[in-house]
Amino acid sequence: MISRTYVINLARRPDKKDRILAEFLKLKEKGVELNCVIFEAVDGNNPEHLSRFNFKIPNWTDLNSGKPMTNGEVGCALSHWSVWKDVVDCVENGTLDKDCRILVLEDDVVFLDNFMERYQTYTSEITYNCDLLYLHRKPLNPYTETKISTHIVKPNKSYWACAYVITYQCAKKFMNANYLENLIPSDEFIPIMHGCNVYGFEKLFSNCEKIDCYAVQPSLVKLTSNAFNDSETFHSGSYVPSNKFNFDTDKQFRIVYIGPTKGNSFHRFTEYCKLYLLPYKVIDEKETNDFVSLRSELQSLSEQDLNTTLMLVVSVNHNDFCNTIPCAPTNEFIDKYKQLTTDTNSIVSAVQNGTNKTMFIGWANKISEFINHYHQKLTESNAETDINLANLLLISSISSDFNCVVEDVEGNLFQLINEESDIVFSTTTSRVNNKLGKTPSVLYANSDSSVIVLNKVENYTGYGWNEYYGYHVYPVKFDVLPKIYLSIRIVKNANVTKIAETLDYPKELITVSISRSEHDSFYQADIQKFLLSGADYYFYISGDCIITRPTILKELLELNKDFVGPLMRKGTESWTNYWGDIDPSNGYYKRSFDYFDIIGRDRVGCWNVPYLASVYLIKKSVIEQVPNLFTENSHMWNGSNIDMRLCHNLRKNNVFMYLSNLRPYGHIDDSINLEVLSGVPTEVTLYDLPTRKEEWEKKYLHPEFLSHLQNFKDFDYTEICNDVYSFPLFTPAFCKEVIEVMDKANLWSKGGDSYFDPRIGGVESYPTQDTQLYEVGLDKQWHYVVFNYVAPFVRHLYNNYKTKDINLAFVVKYDMERQSELAPHHDSSTYTLNIALNEYGKEYTAGGCEFIRHKFIWQGQKVGYATIHAGKLLAYHRALPITSGKRYILVSFVN
């Protein structure tokens, strides 16, 4: 049994505390009472909390991304350590027994159905020493793990430490490992302690006594649907150590940036420096050139700093934009510099290619000698050569007087992007490689087309999207909500104006402008009205876009972008309101490698894109910076439309455009014309699919299922036993109306021992009291449901399995008069859907389904939830008898 449950919770997150306590209350209502302790987490963003611990961080950076530990990861690691210490203290002072079992939970977990029953069943299979048992995790290579018994595996490397059970012996081993002397993320430390290799850091704990570790399969808990988006661990800044000792070096590293500070790319440059803990100094060279600026900076350093500072110099022409991304930690720059040089006198530079950017790295004292020597030579010769860093490196390459410069020809450190083929994207490492297989530490662009590629690099590095962690959302909360100028251009749909009424935003802060103008002059005139309105943001909605999410405005504001818009898609077509790339030969659409992943929401995030139209939110400062947003100029391609002009002008002024597909915000529908409609529209019914698809989905599909229809990766489904899953599919309205249709038709078959069924043309081995969907005219609608809603989920669930056809679809009624149960059987299907249509415990009692080979009974399925399992040979099952009432289920055999 579980002796005590620790729930790690930040004191400043009472919302998460209330949610997890509600989970324990649900268990209590089912007769399961856990001794729960809300354990105050260490807040990694609170220096006072961190000062309580004497800890050191080794030279830790994540091997995949190069990122250091975040404040949240430090706080999380110290929180778990504190729990382990409390367990040891409680055992040693007698408040816990030595043979105790301790459940450790983070506050974003959810107990799965029959948690305690399944926990007892699973743990009864453990007949060997087990120090730690994972109840939920993310295994990196699940297919290589050894299965010990039906529900227990021997884990390899796993991520997450959100739910596990430990013994006193385990806690003591953790305490004896000197974890605080080598603090790394807790979900890296635990695998090391059960024998996994983690980037070489296992050497730090090589002398520690290892634990016996196992994991349940399937999991007994899950994470909340927004666990990652609301994660303190992932979504906090990089931890900045208080001294250099923590990074095992007495040397310094510094970036000196000389160049313009205008445009979004400079802000991005500084954000990457902060992420990777790269110290930087900015020199805006408006008054002098880069040579003079750098010489002056070096002269200001002490001799000690000159001798101990490895300096990376990034110089950008003042007529250009920064467009440079550093994406590596300090130690990587130091290591690569050592690899590329033979001694400390050398300076490593990017390949000189006549760009507006100059980059090199070397020890500050040697750079100072190099510059002073060059300056002295020019002075002695009275040369009139233009003195700048680019010329300095050019001369060094052809003069024997300057032989200390080594060019980084393979792009180990510096990679100029000319076109997309220069780099290779990764969806798992938050880094990119070049075509030689090197992983550059600095990437930069110099042309319009290469800047578009560099902006894609932003999407997959830093805080961008990653296959393991998704996208890091840092919502900005406003103390005072900004004023909004809402501009709506009506084309066909007059009802689009209702968005102003449905927006979840204070109406007194919205100025609404509605226009029917079809002339391009409308746009430029409209932003002039905006500037006079006193509003802070310009929010534009085109008349062919239907907004379905009332919170869209608040959510776009929270992204804190200068220019941002939601994904708008036309049905299931590939037509959307954004372009992932632009053809440099004509200025029009070019498909990007990730276009379909983004519009299908297989990858969810906020994306830097080159073109965005139809719906967008613009900060006032952008319009003040680029007042002629919609004006055509000589640099544009012939035939550029108004949206192309807007995006061209934004790109030219280094204003990034961001596309959010974090939520389903709405869609494009240019075919509707509600102006001609009169009277009250009729209520949508079961039969109105697909003719009234949007309304049908909203009324009948479960909101959770509908919101994940384009991307099931984070969908909230449960594996109730091996390869049997439960998930929300329909609303109670759907279930209620299906029962009403069936009872009204009154076409129920005899069931029971009536084996001949003329509806299916022969003998039914396991007859039920049912009505086929085709008998009530719902077969075509069900076909649409299976192939457009269920089949995409099945592809996600069963390794891209493609649904072929529907064998049968029918509603079964179990009652006390005619048939209350069904004998054990296999279904004649590849997979079977079973949807609960009425409420367990209220409209019927007992019943349910027993999966005989799994030794598992599934009762109490929620209304509208579907169970999906394999048919034919694998899922041998039976319907258990009800004891009162009537039980309705919708069953479909699918191949």
UniProtKB/Swiss-Prot annotation:
Instruction: Check the record and name the InterPro entries matching this protein.
Output: Collagen_mod_GT25, Glyco_trans_25, Nucleotide-diphossugar_trans, Oxoglu/Fe-dep_dioxygenase_dom, Pro_4_hyd_alph
The record describes the protein's role as: Displays two enzymatic activities involved in procollagen processing. Forms hydroxylysine residues in -Xaa-Lys-Gly- sequences in collagens. These hydroxylysines are subsequentially glucosylated by a glucosyltransferase activity. Collagen post-translationally modified is detected in mimivirus virion.
State if Metal-binding is listed as a keyword.
yes
The protein's required cofactors = Fe cation; L-ascorbate
Q: Which reaction does this enzyme catalyse, per its entry? A: L-lysyl-[collagen] + 2-oxoglutarate + O2 = (5R)-5-hydroxy-L-lysyl-[collagen] + succinate + CO2
**What molecular functions are annotated in GO for this chain?**
iron ion binding; L-ascorbic acid binding; procollagen galactosyltransferase activity; procollagen-lysine 5-dioxygenase activity
Sites binding Fe cation sit at H825, D827, H877
Q: Which organism does this sequence originate in?
A: Acanthamoeba polyphaga mimivirus
Upper taxonomic lineage: Viruses, Varidnaviria, Bamfordvirae, Nucleocytoviricota, Megaviricetes
Gene3D superfamilies on file: q2cbj1_9rhob like domain
Q: Where is this region: Lysyl hydroxylase region?
A: 1-194
Q: What is this protein called?
A: Procollagen lysyl hydroxylase and glycosyltransferase
Annotated catalytic residues: R887
Q: Which residues form a coiled coil?
A: none
UniProt-listed Enzyme Commission number(s): 1.14.11.4, 2.4.1.-
